[in-house]
Amino acid sequence: MQLTELSIRSQNLFIRDYIEEKKEMTTFFDYDIHSEHTWKKRYDDLMKMSFPREALADYMSAYHAKFESAAMRQNIEKIRDKRSVMVVGGQQAGLLTGPLYTIHKIISIIQFAKEKETELGVPVIPVFWVAGEDHDVDEINFVYTSGEKGPVKQKLSLHNVKKAAAKRIPLDQEKTEIWLRDVFSTYEESAYTNDLLVQLLRCLRKSQTFTDFFEWIVCDLFEEDGLLLFNSGDLGVKPLERTLFKHIVETNDEVTNRLNESQAAMKRAGYQPIIEAGDNQANLFYEYDEERFLIEKENGRFFISEVGLTWTKEELLKEVEEHPERFSNNVVTRPLMQETLLPTLAFMAGHGEVNYWGELKGIFEHFHLKMAPVLPRLHVTILERHIDKKLPVRELSVEEVLTNGVKEKKDAHFQQSLPDSFVQAVEHAKRELANAHGVMRQEALEIEPNFEQLLDKNAKFIEDQLQFVYQKVAQRVEEKEGYILRDFERIENSLKPLDAPQERIWNIMYFLNKYGPEFFKTFKNLPFSFQNKQQIVKL
């Protein structure tokens, strides 16, 4: 296994400037991630703050007991140490861990925590925030597998889910096992297939919900690393969140104003905000009849129009006090909850998260908080040996494929494969027939002027017939050189499937099935660098 790096620029201008230090970013962030002094400064700032360490450790101890992990228990006890801090990142609870970027983010969290623990000489705990409150089920109920014509979405069908949070979505054991076996039927059987399938079925048997299944698999993959899981949808954590929920209700209009101001500043700087939040949003969700609804506000009242609920501010504060388990954060307030509960040395973010966190600085200031340093996660591409060998044969580089895909080179190759004499003959036929048809058209219109539409259709028909012949010949050339076409398709499907980064489409199980547990152990411990470059792992 070999690790190399490539500099591939983001298409998002805000991310590009953030990574490349093109503009002063203090307007949007509290810390400069490029400064070597940032981590000590952030640590000193955290030591001046107060966190519910004992209550948090007690809760985490109870939640993680089911995993029976010594490494987890050790890190949970570190929470009680007032010197300890955390590296935090999160994601939705996708099936089989979801796209590869979830695995890459977890590796980022663990490796950066180890690096800073050595550098600062204090306990640094890796924490993965599981978005158990998320109710966008269609974003997590599938994986992609490889089909004859590229990636195929393998979806686990669900019934009567409504707007339930992931933590509440029950897993039908029988249906999920059938789905899992269907996924594995698309993989080539290897020496590792049976053991991996048994391991996943064991995780499934222990799971009641989507979130459970996700957590058991993550625990299996990273148990020895002591990764802690913070399930934001778990009812046990809600009493710890009560205080901030109240502050959000009490100063709701100011939260909205600060967001609007930050987004306006971002637009003035030439960037595009991505948070879609109207002035009537209260930035909190409320669970009613096992569904999750966004609370809105107007004229001093809070309401959920879909179910006819309404509160005054005082009534809503009372509801938070008595039933914090009914409330959850939205994209605006989740970072605030993280900052108040967890001593976060660094937040490990995807590019989209970097963008939206940049819209929240004013809200952090309103709550007298500093936003944790927002560090872009590792972006990794796995380059399999058979793909690596095909690249030079097809005159492609990894950088070229990741940046532009293969279509241009593929089309150029087949254009060159058509004999020039044939292409010229078709073009000549088009010109000659067009000229002949023009003469005929003129004669026909002198006899019957109303034939103009008929003649237009006739000309189009003749042109289409020539194009039909051209396409049939081109198709036959492609068939004769099918192995070349398949090379281009295999390269594309591996490195840039569906014109997207590999890590956004493929799932880790394909690689675990093909290369086994030792591959993953080596992979997750590679010496990745946090220099905001594309990490290329050659197998």
Swiss-Prot record:
InterPro entries: Bacillithiol_biosynth_BshC, CC_BshC, Rossmann-like_BshC. Signal peptide: none annotated. Keywords: Coiled coil, Ligase. One of its GO terms (molecular function) is ligase activity. Residues 249-270 form a coiled coil. Its EC number is 6.-.-.-. The keyword Ligase applies. Pfam families: CC_BshC (PF24850), Rossmann-like_BshC (PF10079). The keyword Ion transport does not apply. It comes from the Bacteria. It is an enzyme of class 6 (ligase). Belongs to the BshC family. Involved in bacillithiol (BSH) biosynthesis. May catalyze the last step of the pathway, the addition of cysteine to glucosamine malate (GlcN-Mal) to generate BSH. This is Putative cysteine ligase BshC. It comes from Bacillus pumilus (strain SAFR-032). The gene is bshC.
